Amino acid sequence: MNDAVAIDVRGLSKSFDGKRVVRDLTLTVARGEIFGFLGPNGSGKTTSIRMLCGLLIPDAGEGHCLGYDVIRETAQIKREVGYMTQRFSLYEDLSVRENLDFVARIYGVQNRARVVDAAIERLGLAQRREQLAGTLSGGWKQRLALAATTLHNPKLLLLDEPTAGVDPKARRDFWLAIHQLAAEGITVLVSTHYMDEAERCHRLAYLSFGQILTQGTPSQVAASSGLTTWVVAGPDLMQLAEALQRLPAVAQVVPFGDALHVSGTDAAQLATALAPYQARVELTWTQTQPGLEDVFIQLVTEAGEGKA
């Protein structure tokens, strides 16, 4: 396996009770890269992450994580990985420092006190080191969980929807910490529902019904979508949206603040269909690049139609 590659898997699949949850997962992630997994609930994100870090054995496929075989060397993978689950899993009746000291003991961390103090400083927890974990806000709990996840100096972080239910400022601060860790050479694989977080990833993949529908940098994903998108502003937008949604050339109409994003997969047909509406003086039309949310709404719509 190339030393520059952290994850290289091909054709990973997993079923539960006869239902295929992940199908033919093929993925390459570079060392020091932040790679995002996006998709609706039940799309296979968590199962994929658990297979990559050795917590689940795939039913089919092959590959390596950190140079170890994902089927035969799962114990070695686990020692090199930090896995942060969706739910806060530390002890709420212990302080910040007590929790970190406990986790460090479990991992057998040498120079435990120094390592714990360094983690507290790195994640900005110094003012809260004696505070009980149960009294922390959601954002501070996530910082504490991230500190615990990195105590044993892992080479790969797997973060499963780490900022769900966290306010925007706390999410931003959390992502600053993730980028700092990536800059230090740690590879990060993260699942998220938030489009602004997806744009913070170096590369990303979108899953639906257990399959990767698209992957690449955020700009590559948007450019390869085949969508043409217009932004329209003006009065009575909800009535306008209802009318536009009835046009065959319009794939989707999505409200964004005080405007609508109107997208289609055939630029010429879309232009023809929108021409009468673009002639209305009370409406302002601007063509724009499709955003990730435009792309992902289209992907999940197409995937749902394919399963119908």
What is each PLM-predicted segment?
Residues 61-72, 76-77:
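Conserved ABC transporter NBD signature motif
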Residues 93, 132-136:
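Conserved ABC ATPase signature
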Residues 101, 105-128:
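Conserved ABC ATPase "signature" region
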Residues 157-160:
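Catalytic Walker B motif of ABC-type/P-loop ATPase nucleotide-binding domains
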Residues 176-265:
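ABC transporter nucleotide-binding domain
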Residues 263-308:
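C-terminal coupling/interaction segments
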